[in-house]
UniProtKB/Swiss-Prot annotation:
Family that this chain belongs to: Belongs to the thioester dehydratase family. FabZ subfamily.
Organism: Streptococcus gordonii (strain Challis / ATCC 35105 / BCRC 15272 / CH1 / DL1 / V288)
Gene assigned in the entry: fabZ
Catalysed reactions, semicolon-separated: a (3R)-hydroxyacyl-[ACP] = a (2E)-enoyl-[ACP] + H2O
Gene Ontology terms for molecular function: (3R)-hydroxyacyl-[acyl-carrier-protein] dehydratase activity
Keywords: Cytoplasm, Lipid A biosynthesis, Lipid biosynthesis, Lipid metabolism, Lyase
Compartment list: Cytoplasm
Entries under Pfam families matching the protein: FabA
Keyword Lipid biosynthesis applies: yes
Active site per the UniProt annotation: 47
Protein name: 3-hydroxyacyl-[acyl-carrier-protein] dehydratase FabZ
A GO CC annotation given for this chain: membrane
InterPro entries membership: FabA_FabZ, FabZ, HotDog_dom_sf
Length: 140
């Protein structure tokens, strides 16, 4: 298991933008991680105060960070950055609210040089909350 210290070593993100709490499973090309969503998240102050819902773009960011942990934990990529290059086929199926535990899966399906394509999904209680195809560029 990759704990929060290893996540922080791999990713440059910090509060309030660090959206991965723990890695549950990891293999060469796939990772499963979680984010505990609490009412204390700063984005709930404005989205929406009377009906707090995690913004979909932040769910996708959490998925991107999940993929980033896997890629940046590899010896050859330590100290590098991963940048979003695109998103495709993004779908939001279920609202994510305070108290939810977001289980995020990212599977690398294609690599070409410094570009990688990832199939990603986020689930709450075994139900699909969001999914999409993410494209990344690995930079210096």
């Amino acid at each position: 298991m990759i704990d929060i210290n290893a996540i922080k070593e791999a990713l440059p993100h910090r509060y309030p933008m660090l959206l991965v709490d723990r890695v549950l499973e990891v293999s060469e090309d796939e990772i499963v991680a979680l984010k505990n969503v609490t009412i204390n998240e700063p984005f709930f102050n404005g989205h929406f105060p009377q009906y707090p819902v995690m913004p979909g773009v932040l769910i996708m960011e959490a998925l991107a960070q999940t993929a980033g942990v896997l890629e940046l934990s590899k010896e050859e990529n330590k100290g590098k950055l991963v940048f979003y290059a695109g998103m495709d086929k993004v779908k939001f199926k279920k609202q994510v609210v305070p108290g939810d535990q977001l289980i995020m899966t990212a599977k690398f399906v294609k690599r070409r040089g410094t570009i990688a394509v990832v199939e990603a999904k986020a689930e709450v209680d075994g139900k699909l909350a969001a999914s999409g195809t993410l494209t990344f560029a690995i930079g210096q």
